[in-house]
Amino acid sequence: DPELKSLIQNTNYCIVDSKHKISLLEDYAEKKLPIVDITPFDTRADFGISQQLTVQNILVPIDTIEQSKFEELIVLFASYFETNETARVHFFTRNANWDRVDSVLNFTREVLKVNGLDERLARKETNDKAEFDLDEEKKVPIKFFVDQCVDELSISKCIREQRIMVDVTARPDLYLQISCISSAIPQIVSFNTQYVHDAKNGFIVKEVSEVLNGLKYYLDNITNWNKCMIYSYELGKEYNTASLIRKWKGVMKQVEQD
């Protein structure tokens, strides 16, 4: 769009929500620009309740995930369950469709079946007591869940119960990344942003297969998880309300001078 390009080229100031977008915008405008990155979300120290739970919840955003990566993740998690009985996967979706939960679980079961794995790991939760009277069912606890979160309140409640986030989508969810910093939980991501520092508050992976090492590093070793919690707490200070206000004041002052 020539009009948009001209507008950006002649602007006095640009605001982006993360540092990685600075180079993208300058490449588009074909010139250096007066840009500052300010996250649209602030951090609020809220360490959640994951340490109080008897299970280790793994949050996995899926709304923009490639199907091949989704399939690979499902198989990887099923394999990880064999060595970590307390691990539980929570597929995260903002999709409010009435059949979203069923469609995700159906897909998960199909992938498990095709790969010779127990599809009961992804059966739907039910209040029907008759199901649990069966000895066989008791031996196979549900390990795949779908968290359908359509507002900030439900997302916040969901994050508080997670032990780690695994996001291998091509577009990072900044709200989730900031929320993970607030809750001080590790993040395994495939997209490099300033909110995840490799080997500090998470890992940046190139291949889905690398996720397994990250899970073992943080979920099988409480010391590593605690180090991440401390680092996340310090990192969160860079994006708290006071820090964002200072940045905005700096922008306003610069604009007034121009």
Where are these regions (language model features)?
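A short, active-site helix/loop in glycosyltransferases that binds the activated sugar's phosphate group
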Residues: 3-33
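Acidic donor-binding loop of glycosyltransferase active sites
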Residues: 12, 157-172, 185
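Conserved donor-binding/catalytic core segment of Leloir-type glycosyltransferases
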Residues: 15, 51-69, 74-78, 89-92
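Short beta-strand->alpha-helix junction loop in the catalytic core
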Residues: 20, 37-47, 95
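Nucleotide-activated donor-binding/catalytic signature segment of Leloir-type glycosyltransferases, i.e.
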Residues: 102-150
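A short, well-ordered alpha-helix in the C-terminal region of glycosyltransferases
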Residues: 217, 224-238, 250
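C-terminal alpha-helical cap of glycosyltransferases
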Residues: 241-258
